[in-house]
Amino acid sequence: MLLGGALLLRLVLALVTDGYPYDMSCFVAWGDKLAAEGPAAFYSEGYFADYPPGYLWVLGLVGAIRAALHIAYESKWTYFLLALVPSLCDCGLAWLVYRTAKRSSRGVKEHTALVLTAFTAFNPLMLFDTGVWKQIDGAFALPLVLCFVLLEQRRYLPAAVLYGVALAIKPQALLFGPVLAVCYLAAITLEKDRLRAFGRCFGGAALALLPPLLTGLPFFGVVQLIPKLIDKYTGTMSGYPYATINAFNWLAALGGNWKGQADPALFGISWQQLGCLNILLVTAGLAYFAVRSVRGGWFSPLLLAAYYGIGIFTLAHCMHERYMVPGVLLTLLAAAHWNDIRLYAAGVGLSLTGFINLATVYSQTGTSDEWLTSATSSTVAVLTGLGETVCFVLLIFAVWDIARHGHTLALPETKPETAPPVPAPQPKWTRRELGA
């Protein structure tokens, strides 16, 4: 019932709102082109399509359904069809949170598991992203998050396949590549059969490449498959040379929104140099936490992925507003796994700052303040960026404590209310005493 209500709410929002216009026009146009011309003619010369082939198959199916039923672009049912798959994936993510909490060895109570599941199902960030904005981040995040859930269970090869599925959908999966590499390297030290674990690294890499290759083959053919895929992924990742692209993070708090990455930032260095330095620091932190947690027996792919995903969003350059979505969901999954109040707080805080971020960008689209240059929008960006950074710092404290010491801060237990004492039985009055 909980997940059914969450699905219904998303689909109702999809019907009564217009969606982010730039994404909507791309999704509809791509789906129509793929349905009409087929995959081999899709990436034609001069045609803008910055998505890899993975999710284009879903958009093509939407285009085919619209053509068969004569559904116009302006129809609300077009938005409904576009939001259907991501909405189902959002509900799958909420169910995954519940299953993770129930399987936790940290004593997550049924009430806590249900509350966390309800928050994930009705998360304001995900409701807005899927139901109003109508992006596909839920469909991208589900295989990516499930990959790290499987890594938590040491199911390395299925995890590699799911990472490949996420990579086939969006290039942003590459941001989590270092975490995947750390998990496979840690397996070499965690298992007795190190030769087998070492071979599994190569097997996992091959399996991770399989979904992008298979989904891209009809688009590019055998000869051009690998060169075209490399060009598609590198071109997409480098297509927005700005300090931050409406991402309310630490760089936005410093005034970097829509600033060219070559512009000066702090102490004479450019935004790009600052972002690269921050990426190195976050990656060094990932390596440190991984080594310490392996030695202590507290290695957790979910925890490391949450740290790295939010760390890159907070401190790196070229970030979009929605790049935080997988990191937020991973933080909620890590909270369900570790039952740590700091992780719960970070997940809730990041969800709220992400919602404010998306709502601000969406509300100003098509207005004179679309680039968020007004005093009000700039202030919102700075304050929200500071709030998001505070949530990341809280996340770091939790990761530091768990990775180094295996120490968690559980939710305070509420003592059950004790019933008032039953009064002692009173002596019965006799008729003689009553008449006295």
Segments predicted by a language model, with ranges:
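Specific aromatic-rich, kink-prone transmembrane helix
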Residues: 96-99, 139-156, 330-331
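Extracytosolic helix-loop segments that constitute the early lumenal/periplasmic catalytic or substrate-binding loops
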Residues: 23-50, 54, 61-72, 224-232
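Perimembrane helix-loop-helix junctions
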Residues: 176-210, 222, 326
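Aromatic/glycine/proline-enriched transmembrane-helix motif characteristic
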Residues: 91-94, 103, 232-314, 400-406, ...
